Curated annotation (Swiss-Prot):
Localization terms from the record: Nucleus; Chromosome; Cytoplasm
Residues the record lists as Phosphoserine modifications: S333, S360, S422, S442, S1334, S1360, S1366, S1372, S1373, S1391, S1395
SMART domains, sorted: CENPB (SM00674), ZnF_C2H2 (SM00355)
PANTHER family linked to this entry: POGO TRANSPOSABLE ELEMENT DERIVED WITH ZNF DOMAIN (PTHR24388:SF45), ZINC FINGER PROTEIN (PTHR24388)
InterPro entries: DDE_SF_endonuclease_dom, Homeodomain-like_sf, HTH_CenpB_DNA-bd_dom, Snail/Krueppel_Znf, Znf_C2H2_sf, Znf_C2H2_type
Cross-link (Glycyl lysine isopeptide (Lys-Gly) (interchain with G-Cter in SUMO2)): K319, K356, K419, K446, K486, K626, K674, K797, K879
ZnF C2H2-type: positions: 372-394, 491-513, 527-550, 557-580, 587-610, 616-638, 644-667, 767-790, 811-836
Feature: compositional bias, Low complexity: 239-266, 410-439
GO molecular function list: DNA binding; zinc ion binding
Domain DDE-1: 1113-1319
Subunit structure: Interacts with CBX1, CBX3, MAD2L2 and CHAMP1. Interacts with CBX5; POGZ competes with PXVXL motif-containing proteins such as INCENP and TRIM28 for interaction with CBX5. Interacts (via IBM motif) with PSIP1 (via IBD domain); phosphorylation increases its affinity for PSIP1. Interacts with HDGFL2.
The name this protein goes by in its record: Pogo transposable element with ZNF domain
Amino acid sequence: MADTDLFMECEEEELEPWQKISDVIEDSVVEDYNSVDKTTSVSVSQQPVSAPVPIAAHASVAGHLSTSTTVSNSGAQNSDSTKKTLVTLIANNNAGNTLVQQGGQPLILTQNPAPGLGTMVTQPVLRPVQVMQNANHVTSSPVASQPIFITTQGFPVRNVRPVQNAMNQVGIVLNVQQGQTVRPITLVPAPGTQFVKPTVGVPQVFSQMTPVRPGSTMPVRPTTNTFTTVIPATLTIRSTVPQSQSQQTKSTPSTSTTPTATQPTSLGQLAGQPPGQSNQTSNPKLAPSFPSPPAVSIASFVTVKRPGVTGENSNEVAKLVNTLNTVPSLGQSPGPVVVSNNSSAQRTSGPESSVKVTSSIPVFDLQDGGRKICPRCNAQFRVTEALRGHMCYCCPEMVEYQKKGKSLDAEPSVPSAAKPSSPEKTAPVTSTPSSTPIPALSPPTKVPEPNENAGDAVQTKLIMLVDDFYYGRDGGKAAQLTSFPKVATSFRCPHCTKRLKNNIRFMNHMKHHVELDQQNGEVDGHTICQHCYRQFSTPFQLQCHLENVHSPYESTTKCKICEWAFESEPLFLQHMKDTHKPGEMPYVCQVCQYRSSLYSEVDVHFRMIHEDTRHLLCPYCLKVFKNGNAFQQHYMRHQKRNVYHCNKCRLQFLFAKDKIEHKLQHHKTFRKPKQLEGLKPGTKVTIRASRGQPRTVPVSSNDAPSGTLQEAAALTSTDPLPVFLYPPVQRNIQKRAVRKMSVMGRQTCLECSFEIPDFPNHFPTYVHCSLCRYSTCCSRAYANHMINNHVPRKSPKYLALFKNSVSGIKLACTSCTFATSVGDAMAKHLVFNPSHRSSNILPRGLSWMSHLRPGQASERVFDWSMKNTYLPPPLVPNKAATVKPVGVTPAEPQELAGPVLQALPSPASTATPPATPTHPQPSALPPSATEGTECLNVSEQEEGSPVTQDPEPASGGGGGSGVGKKEQLSVKKLRVVLFALCCNTEQAAEHFRNPQRRIRRWLRRFQASQGENLEGKYLSFEAEEKLAEWVLIQREQQLPVNEETLFQKATKIGRSLEGGFKISYEWAVRFMLRHHLTPHARRAVAHTLPKHVAENAGLFIEFVQRQIHNQDLPLSMIVAIDEISLFLDTEVLSSDDRKENALQTVGTGEPWCDVVLAILADGTVLPTLVFFRGQANRFANVPDSILLEAKDSGYSDDEIMELWSTRVWKKHTACQHSKSMLVMDCHRTHLSEEVLALLSASSTLPAVVPAGCSSKIQPLDVCIKRTVKNFLHKKWKEQAREMADAACDSDVLLQLVLVWLGEVLGVIGDSPELVQRSFLVASVLPGPDGNVNSPTRNADMQEELIASLEEQLKLNGEQSEEHSASAPRPRSSPEETVEPESLHQLFEGESETESFYGFEEADLDLMEI
């Protein structure tokens, strides 16, 4: 037994109510969970020992007789009937076998050392026993068995020597210590197998057998240490019947699938009878007759309970032992007889016989006729809910079929009598009122092959890790909250009066104040853990805690619930057993009831799901507030010393009642682990802290003979049996099917990419990873999965066992356009998209693929017969690598370009792939992160070469050698294209020093290759929509969307929704194009928004148009307002170069100035308000259409809205005596109480545009706002070139900006029709016919408006290039289509070697990049 194992047992009391097989649960059976704290597991093997024991001569009982005798203990009685000593023995026999065979197996039970038991007593009398016998003719049998001795106090067995018959040996001598409760034991030996069946009751404790004489040994394995981490106890008995006898029958009687604990108890009836009372029935007609199966050696099934008396009943114990030696019913019987404290007589026969039991005690079936069975694995369930939950995991496709028309209740149950394969194998069954047919445990549709079911009698075992058993998470109502639009609420800090834009920033700001106090010395923070907020006595203890608990490396001795580390795994397991419950989730989000066993998951959940809401989360006790002042006061009170820490988790509370309520409500099992759902009671569950094999406890030669050592080793080696999803019969069928596949020739495994020389060895069985949802039949793929994903080490030690990928093979999903060459990537895609049924195998890189019609390639399956005649060359090594789990993403382009270009060779130097594929080191990422291709690793991978080059046919000649290289862009080019999509083509050209036409050409090439090369939808559809919504919201707030921020957000969403995914530039470019996220799209109103964003937009349009109609609002009272923030980099402005980059419209800090634009639905442009951070005394030339406000400290969002309402809006509404409507976004502080009060005072109805919808339904975003920003950019760049060497400060720049704003506002003000049509395009106003225009019509209008305004502002030349970049042209100019490879061939082919040597590699690199 390993010190790192924790044995659990799936018992009836621990199951959910719908999982219980029996509908009636007696109160006396229910146990306290804490009653398993002091138990141990003992594994015992019957071995020959050098001590003889005389075996009593058994009397023969002949004739047809059925007897039932009940004798209860006549000693001192205890009020608790469950503590009385009661032994129930039931034996049934048939006409062909004896009730007692020669050399039977007696069971000797003692409680105190009787005086007469110095040597084995042969003829005592049994008092507390009930015997049910059904004997027929007595015949002799050569089968011998072993006696079993169970004692409670030092039972002295002397002169224990083998008898003359070598087959009759001592079986077991167990010693139960005084004062300990005894768990009922069920012993079921079967030929050549092991059987373990503890029943429901109190735990059992066995101690080491104390020898009477020095040197004598007992076959009981001693405990090697005093620390035990195993519960509850199990007892394993092995039979010593020769294999020649056990093989006489093909099917071994077994009751492993029928739990004894679920049978109705009859113990109360037996124990309640007066002492000595007997009930005899001698009607020979009730004796059934059974066929004669071959004789097997079995042991009687005995339930022993601890009596309430000790020394004075030693005579009774002696009588008990003597009677056990004389009662004939203790001999052999043709089938195992089960007797326990809560079950009646049961008899199980093999599939080839039918059984009838006659008894005066009620007899129950092993399973009733109402059971439901799984149609795939034949697992049996009593209630439909349990079967449905099992089928959702076992056979989900059948569940879908059931939902379409067939009910689960119509599932056929197990037949009571299976159809026989031959008439000789089934005996006639006489139906009587007292007989109950016992159906076969599995339908005997096919006789199993020899030795295939050798291990079927082994009891069900399940091996689980601590993470699976104790930890879990529950989604709560988080999914329901995602449909509601998020509205950011600003909070003002009471310490520094700073206003934070949303709740998460306010929470971080409060933590920052505490850190400042600690740095200033106001609060002692040298002994406070900044992760779990615990107080330590010394800094050294804090340092040890940080290294052991909060390090990034996984540890098998760290409790993730309470975040404590332990010295060893046994101590850790003991802590888990004593402190925590299975499925305990004490950390709860009070907003949506999301809960988890890990604090970090709840914290990440709140920051992601409840961002931009009014909720504030206390990091100390997870209490949620809606008021900023209350949150601040509560937060600061946690900094005091008098807080109440929970000793079962990391939370701390301000009041004792909160702590008590927390412990009562949350420190209990919230939901049982999914692996335990549907398990039968009695299943042995082994809990392990680590993933390694359990260590074998050595047994010295002085404690046990050599035979015992071998048996103990055999038992230990069979302990960690894997969990199979199919029953043994079905596994054997699968193995036979795999063996038949070997005749198909040599094949290649799609999972590990290796050839399959031997199918049975390569696909040994279907295994399921206990740590995740990974399942496979490939042994190499399973080993690689465990090495890469579940081996806790600080640095990668082993390379992956995968090859690069199968050459020429590609997998295409039959339900969508997803295609990949990595089998695991396709498996993950199918898992995350359950509606996608299957995938097809396609050849990749073949010349005829480009001539197939759309959809034709997905229907054609690759023929492996082509392998001998057509072999594609090996592929380029994978560009595999991904983001680190801590959130490290590729750096900014300017930081990466230098070292990457220096470290990477040129494209021409990597035209020939290496002969041996390189294997990338596995990173500490989720499984999907290390799979696939085309991901950037700037430290190892080649960025200049194409990511994947499609292989060309070997016989294709050299004419088309350059075609495949043009299919996909290199990583360098993809980075440039991604930059252009995040910003614009002009900025990308300036940043990477590439012509804009070349960037647009790369973009067109990438768009053209999308139809044939859809290699990477790495995120699910739901995750991509969430990421697209984030991009739209970032753009609305003028926050940066670049390579770094995009990859960081994608990683965060991928980890939270899917457990991780891989990142590549190709995926990023496709994502931006797939969701139309280019910043300067001219038909944005026709693009599809994410699902719930589009729903919010529809609700907004419906609300606005209904209010306009109901309130009869005039067009002059419908206003749209939006802000434009300008960011100034003063350092760049004062420098001599790059001055054009000083003024930006995207940034994260405080804006240099804010421009508030406002337009009316009748085409009027209201005065524009400009807020400048600084002094504006010298500015006298301010245009009439602009109002300037200046202050050194700047203006807050509330102040901006207040000044705009006072200086602009109230002046406009003063002469209008009508209600009005204000269209604005939900960002900044537009929804604060102050702003809403201002609007209410002016009778203005706020129409708030939902987050992410501004590009489609905000009138200013449709045309005007983007044009104003482009015009300012153009003017400043022209001015920066003119004053490159001249000095320029912010005051001069402000004067220029005011002039440019006046110019652009004048143009807009002269085009009232353009302004009015902006409201129509945004669907704020209905169309001329009263209905909303179609998206296509609105897109045409938007494109026309943008073109008209740009033409007036002379922006059409530059923006036409932008437009050409977003839409591919049908035919490009010859200058743009010329490639460096073609020029290289041209000059080298037509020039003399002496006169021209071709281009240098560096020149080619510059031409391409």
